[in-house]
Regions:
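RNase H-like, metal-dependent nuclease domains and their acidic two-metal-ion catalytic environment used
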Residues: 1-116, 122, 126, 139-208
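Short, surface-exposed amphipathic charged segments that create phosphate/polyanion-binding patches used
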Residues: 124-134
Length: 208
């Protein structure tokens, strides 16, 4: 889920287990209008979360997110975890530059456009909600992902249901990114050959 200045740029891997999906997230934080003011406005210490490995604060003088660093982080996740990438799911808004970079460097990665509209996300959002309740989606307690879930509410219109936020400082980007992935994943059957074991997760395994 792309963010440039005010929002987070969130990467939320959805990993198939034996009988559930494991969701985690990593965010990039812009500093265009100052990190201190952003932390105060969002009510989040990104500085502390960066130390804990949940996010990365941009080092560009402009304060915007560096697409090169985003792609490097995705590559790190894939290589360190030895993933077989079945899809890079993305909202096309502001994704053009990174899309071109991925196409050039990783033509083997399927690119799947998921527009963040109610019509597209209605069924995935309903299924995501139900699957979280039924234990078919689990996550590690990631604080930025937890914050996003707490900040989100479901909005219903004539086309169905999707998530939204009450105000701009309520960040939901990690959850938006997860729903982009789940728009594809929720249709996938479990084949009993999940990527990780419960034991690895319980022993503190991390995707990052």
């Amino acid at each position: 889920d792309v963010g440039r200045v005010s929002d987070l740029f969130a990467i939320s891997p959805m990993v198939m287990m034996d009988d559930y999906w494991y969701l985690d997230s990593f965010s990039f934080v812009a500093t265009k209008y100052g990190l201190t003011s952003k932390e105060k406005r969002d009510g989040v210490s990104y500085t502390n979360l960066e130390r804990q490995g949940y996010c990365e604060i941009t080092t560009l003088e402009s304060g915007v997110i560096d697409d090169e660093r985003v792609l490097e982080k995705i590559e790190e996740m894939v290589y360190q975890n030895d993933w077989e990438v079945n899809g890079i799911c993305f909202d096309p808004y502001q994704f053009g530059t990174l899309l071109t970079m991925i196409e050039k460097r990783h033509p083997e990665w399927p690119l799947i456009e998921v527009s963040q509209t109610t019509m597209v996300l209605n069924m995935p959002t309903k299924q995501f909600r139900d699957d979280v309740k039924n234990g078919k989606i689990k996550h590690s307690g990631n604080p930025l992902l937890t914050m996003a879930v707490n900040n989100a509410y479901t909005k219903v219109d004539n086309n169905g249901m999707r998530i939204d936020k009450n105000k701009n400082s309520n960040k939901i980007d990690p959850l938006d990114a997860g729903l982009d992935a789940y728009a594809v994943c929720y249709l996938e059957p479990f084949d009993g050959a999940g990527y990780w074991t419960d034991e690895k997760i319980l022993n503190g395994g991390t995707l990052f």
